[in-house]
Amino acid sequence: MGKEDKQHINIVVIGHVDSGKSTTTGHLIYKCGGIDQRTIEKFEKEAAELGKGSFKYAWVLDKLKSERERGITIDIALWKFQTSKYEVTVIDAPGHRDFIKNMITGTSQADCAILIIASGTGEFEAGISKDGQTREHALLAFTLGVRQLIVALNKMDTCKWSQDRYNEIVKETSNFIKKVGYNPKSVPFVPISGFNGDNMIEASTNCPWYKGWEKETKAGKSTGKTLLEAIDAIEPPVRPTDKPLRLPLQDVYKISGIGTVPVGRVETGVIKPGMVVTFAPANVTTEVKSVEMHHQQLQAGNPGDNVGFNVKNVSVKEVRRGNVAGDSKNDPPAGCDSFNAQVIVLNHPGQVGNGYAPVLDCHTAHIACKFAELLEKIDRRTGKSVEDKPKFIKSGDAAIVKMIPSKPMCVESFTDFPPLGRFAVRDMRQTVAVGVIKSVEKNTGGSGKVTKAAQKAGKK
């Protein structure tokens, strides 16, 4: 298989602040990745000048991160690495300010999460304690539908590669991920040193007692020794090409000589030239004249593609960021009057009751929504109701809530269209809650604008 033919997968790296996420991720990208020798030499030189003589992989990631935060678009190849089967993109590593928001509205759904645990004495305990970030990140990944997990026990060199310590941590972590919702049998546990490279890409000689990881899923059993092999054993995701088209708009451009060009990422389905699309909640229907990606004309835009498409007889004022395009003949998108969602409160200083109206980030939409009614409080692991019509919910609680958007908005249920069915609740400049949409009350507000181009195309 040539480099071109590898299937793409996305991973997200989670874990406590000092677990060594950057070092581990940096190491993989450095050894198997898209960073060319020149960039590495440049980084090494800078590191030496700054007295970071022990140039290690975290530096790679810190460089990339600071550039990303300063808004310098880094060649996204820098966040990629190869396994024998996959081309892997690291879609985010926490520590980034908007990590939680990115993970939810994020440009893409992670296919697998790698949970990095620090094995040092005291470190592990801190990371996994009640209020630890580890718990929040793992819960978030599970809630948002990331069903595959790999656990890397990092910094094994700090506990002298002790087998007892390894067993103790595997046992504790298994209990911990079970509480979140994962089945430990389907999770590979890999002891590593992201700093020294043990069991990252090649099997380590420091732990003769370690016989390798194994995992068992519906698809069968797989085994291996290294973290790279565990990533290679991720089950290939099925991309939703057969679902109806949903394409949330990131921007709409007016390009002279061409016209109106909406831009966004195809989440489900396929967009093709000649298709008649409906934009919701704008309720405008028109024909797609052409589709392009990276300045090349496409015959079809598939899930995951960031495309621009040219539409006729529609002005820039009529469609905007946050609108969703879909095929007018196949379950077209519509605006909603209200929706019910399972909301998990992460960190709100007070109590949340009926009438609370924060801003929701759902796909590319950014709209204030009112918590119209707290319907029931639920056990967030089982989803079973524990209290009907609670007065308030607080941090740590999960509830089914009826939400009413303050202005027209297009969302979908999580089971039908995952990327349009999860949202972040933002207030006080942070993510205070996350939600997964259970059902949507769509508005059937009459027919909107149908352009001449659409009518013509419809007659063909």
Swiss-Prot record:
PROSITE patterns: G_TR_1, G_TR_2. Residues 71-75 are annotated as: G2. Its main location: cytoplasm. The lineage of its organism: Eukaryota, Fungi, Dikarya, Ascomycota, Pezizomycotina. CDD domains: EF1_alpha (cd01883), EF1_alpha_II (cd03693), EF1_alpha_III (cd03705). Residues 193-195 are annotated as: G5. GTP binds at residues 15-22, 92-96, 154-157. Keywords: Cytoplasm, Elongation factor, GTP-binding, Methylation, Nucleotide-binding, Protein biosynthesis. Residues 92-95 are annotated as: G3. This is Elongation factor 1-alpha. It comes from Aspergillus oryzae (strain ATCC 42149 / RIB 40) (Yellow koji mold). Disulfide bonds: none annotated.
